[in-house]
A protein has these predicted regions:
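Glycine- and acidic-residue-biased ligand/ion/polar-headgroup-sensing regions
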Residues: 413, 426-435, 446-450
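C-terminal subregion of chymotrypsin/trypsin-like serine protease catalytic domains
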Residues: 35-69, 83-85, 91-108, 207-233, ...
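Conserved catalytic-core segment of clan PA serine endopeptidases
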Residues: 38-50, 111-171, 195
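Gram-negative bacterial Sec-dependent N-terminal signal peptides
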Residues: 1-33
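Extracellular, surface-exposed repeat architectures
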Residues: 334-336, 340-419, 456-501
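Solvent-exposed adhesion/ligand-recognition segments of exported proteins
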Residues: 4-6, 269, 287, 291-381, ...
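Chymotrypsin/trypsin-fold serine protease catalytic domain
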Residues: 139, 143-238, 242
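Acidic glycine-/aspartate-rich tracts in secreted/extracellular proteins
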Residues: 106-110, 145-150, 188-192, 253-255, ...
Length: 501
């Protein structure tokens, strides 16, 4: 691979370069590089499949080997591949799970794909963000109006309090004869192609069809945030203008999972070369942000009811506890996620709108959400960011939804929808049991981890040719549970869903 500083930017590339800052370490200014795919030995498709988890690059796959153009083999590190569905489709932000996201501060935080991010085929809205150290750190934590169903997200960061030796043990990998800390990154920066030492401008930034990924190694000591291409590797995807906010990950050998290294922020240079810098993920800052947007509720088998304004609750008739703040300077109400533990009942005696707040039900307990009485059209409704049903938990949902306000379900637990909801279900994980006639107007399965089980012979909306059932972004499983079902067409994206009889 050639020294990156020898490639000169053409006028189009220079225009894109303004989107990614360059930190100069010397007076001699090197050229900032674009998202450059080295195609002397590898096909463009390999980089795209890697970044989109297609073909052999499935999440969790280990020991992946691909063929170079000359017929020789290139073996990826012996690490389970990350799930790159965390990337927003334009690449400038990433999901951290539930209703949280991550980007850099210098991106436009009030417009574009940061204010209205898209994951899969769902468009979300940013309702808040938090800067770190008075905005001196080039990182921003995001709060969305709904739980993201297209990805489980990566919500934990690496530990930057470790020494370099400790980090090498915890996050290091033996690769090509050397112990290294490898960093995996996915983004949608502007695309250049390099072949025969010539660079060709190809495509502008933020094209969802050209999401690509690369493998890098830590540069310098742990904690610097710096990383670079692996010397001598043929599979090279240089960071580009337009890659600001793209997520970078490291593998935690202790926890056997991927954690966030940071968000890609800068090109850094000296007289001889350029490399990359991520703003390090701050676990304490993220927890502070979550604390602002969540409320722990020890239900412990009790019965909870909400007050008339839906800004406070009481358990078993005891004193009210406030959980929603006043509107702030952005005019957004502090709509907290309610995190329930211990099992129990939520009693709803009026239509309840939680805004951007969701309901999180902790593991291995039974919960019931009841409509206490009925209005003229049926049970009272509940709307908000969605439901997160924890592992082993079961939620009996005996209320209705609100037309135009979709239900987003995540978590590995089970939700029994026992009433007609009048809206759409978007499920990314866990099991949804549809026990009412036409339980939802439309069902959208994403991420490949969710199961929709039919508990009623007419649970789906049978208007049209496709039963208003969509498999998208890795799809999911439809368990017909012994019921008869006929399709004229099945709506699916690239990855097919599974129909279980």
């Amino acid at each position: 691979m050639k020294n990156k500083s020898q490639y000169q930017l053409n006028p189009l590339t220079k225009a894109f370069a303004a989107a990614l800052p360059v930190v100069m370490m010397a007076t001699c200014v090197p050229s900032a590089q674009a998202n450059t795919l080295f195609i002397q030995n590898h096909w463009v498709r390999d980089y795209l499949d890697f970044g989109q988890n297609k073909g052999v690059f499935k999440p969790g796959a280990v020991g992946v080997t691909i063929q170079r153009k000359d017929g020789t083999s290139f073996k990826l590190p012996d690490l389970p591949l990350p799930d790159f569905s965390v990337a927003e489709v334009h690449g400038a932000a990433a999901s951290l799970g539930n209703g949280y996201g991550l980007t850099v501060r210098h991106n436009n935080l009030t417009g574009g794909s940061i204010a209205r991010p898209q994951y899969g085929h769902s468009i979300y809205q940013k309702v808040d963000h938090m800067l770190v150290n008075g905005g001196k750190e080039d990182i921003a934590y995001l709060r969305y109006n709904k739980f993201v169903v297209e990805s489980t997200g990566y919500g934990e960061g690496a530990n930057f309090n470790l020494s370099h030796e400790q980090a090498l043990d915890r996050y290091g990998t033996d690769y090509q004869g050397k112990r290294r800390i490898l960093i995996y990154r996915v983004g949608n920066g502007s695309v250049n192609l390099v072949k025969d030492d010539k660079k060709h401008g190809f495509l502008g930034a933020y094209n969802r069809d050209f999401q690509s990924a690369g493998i890098y190694e830590l540069r310098g000591n742990w904690g610097s945030g710096d990383f670079d291409d692996i010397v001598g590797s043929s599979f090279v995807n240089e960071v580009t203008s337009g890659d600001s906010g793209s997520i970078s990950l490291v593998y935690d050998n202790y926890q056997k999972k991927w954690v966030v290294f940071g968000t890609t922020a800068f090109l850094v240079g000296n007289n001889y070369n350029t490399w990359y810098r991520a703003t390090k993920f701050d676990n304490a800052a993220m927890q502070q942000f979550k604390d602002k947007w969540s409320k722990n509720v020890a239900l412990n088998g009790g019965t909870l009811s909400f007050n008339e304004k839906a800004d406070a609750y009481q358990i078993n008739g005891n004193a009210e506890v406030a959980f929603r703040g006043d509107k702030d300077q952005t005019k957004n109400t502090n709509d907290k996620d309610l995190i329930f533990t211990g099992g129990g009942t939520l009693r709803v005696n009026r239509d309840l709108d939680l805004g951007s707040g969701g309901l999180i039900f902790a593991d291995d307990k039974k919960y019931t959400v009841d409509s206490y009485g009925f209005d003229q059209e049926g049970p009272f409704s509940v709307s908000g960011a969605g439901i997160n049903a924890g592992a082993g938990s079961v939620v009996d949902w005996n209320v209705s939804g609100v037309k135009g306000k979709n239900m987003h379900q995540i978590g590995t637990g089970t939700v029994n929808y026992n009433r007609k909801q009048n809206n759409q279900l978007r499920i990314g994980n866990g099991t949804a049991v549809l026990n009412a006639e036409r339980t939802f107007d439309l069902v959208y399965l994403a991420n490949g981890l969710g199961t929709v089980k039919l508990g009623h012979e007419k649970a789906l909306n049978e208007d049209g040719n496709m039963n208003n059932l969509i498999f998208t972004e890795r799809g999911g499983t439809l368990d017909v549970n012994g019921h008869s079902l006929s399709f004229k067409r099945i709506a699916t994206n690239i990855h097919l869903g599974i129909i279980k009889l």
